[in-house]
Swiss-Prot record:
Mg(2+) binds at residues 52, 165. Deamido-NAD(+) binds at residues 140, 173, 180, 260-261. The keyword Ligase applies. Homodimer. This is NH(3)-dependent NAD(+) synthetase. It comes from Listeria innocua serovar 6a (strain ATCC BAA-680 / CLIP 11262). The gene is nadE. Catalyzes the ATP-dependent amidation of deamido-NAD to form NAD. Uses ammonia as a nitrogen source. Keywords: ATP-binding, Ligase, Magnesium, Metal-binding, NAD, Nucleotide-binding. It catalyses: deamido-NAD(+) + NH4(+) + ATP = AMP + diphosphate + NAD(+) + H(+). Belongs to the NAD synthetase family. One of its GO terms (cellular component) is cytoplasm. GO terms for molecular function: ATP binding; glutaminase activity; metal ion binding; NAD+ synthase (glutamine-hydrolyzing) activity; NAD+ synthase activity. SUPFAM superfamilies: Adenine nucleotide alpha hydrolases-like.
Amino acid sequence: MEIRERILADMQVAETIDAHEEIRKSVEFLKAYLKKNTFLKSFVLGISGGQDSTLTGKLAQMAISELRAETGDDEYQFFAVSLPYGTQLDESDRQDALDFMAPDNRLTVNIKASVDASVAALAEAGVELSDFAKGNEKARERMKVQYAIAAMHKGVVVGTDHSAEAVTGFYTKYGDGGTDINPLFRLNKRQGKALLKELGCPEHLYLKKPTADLEDNKPALPDEVALGVTYDQIDDYLEGKEVPADAAAKIENWFIKTEHKRHMAITIFDDFWK
């Protein structure tokens, strides 16, 4: 199988979608998971104010609200967690996103003290973290907090990973990539926008430039700058359309380079890396 055939088979992106149908597909998927696992009662999600967490949060709240209405069980809850490192540059967007999704519970945990303590402890041991490595430390601290909250509320940590992000491995291993359930996987970036438009989301939340915003020295660095390829090109590639050869090569290189992120810890029986 050629590399593009393999990528398209793995990422499961349809060339065209019906936004309403995809919304229902994700909501029913989330509901089915909790109904099957009756010891679980909540969804926990970190909210940044960007497109992906806004969409995921809205879908999670819809699923929880429907479960409560269908079962009469008020223990079903959604926890939307703000996890700033100090002060977030686009805090107003995060508040707009929270207002749009209207979560049952809003929590804020500032991760700055925890991250800075880890950086200082490592420095004391002779390990000086680069700004990039510190960015990954932030992502992992955020996930640690979400799992702590989930542990206290019979919760599932929901991920925001979609296929345009998965194909490039554009997330932190065991950080934002370390979740329990990903309701957006199969969608690319533009399809996520279509779902938010269908849901009546304020446009500025999905038309803004996507950024992981993890590095202190490069605040709000656009994803497309970091990747060297645009989301339109990634989306076209995943929909089976023609893209410039250099863009295709970059996408395929990211896919190969980050394949380890899409696997659990490697064992002697794995051969994908060889």
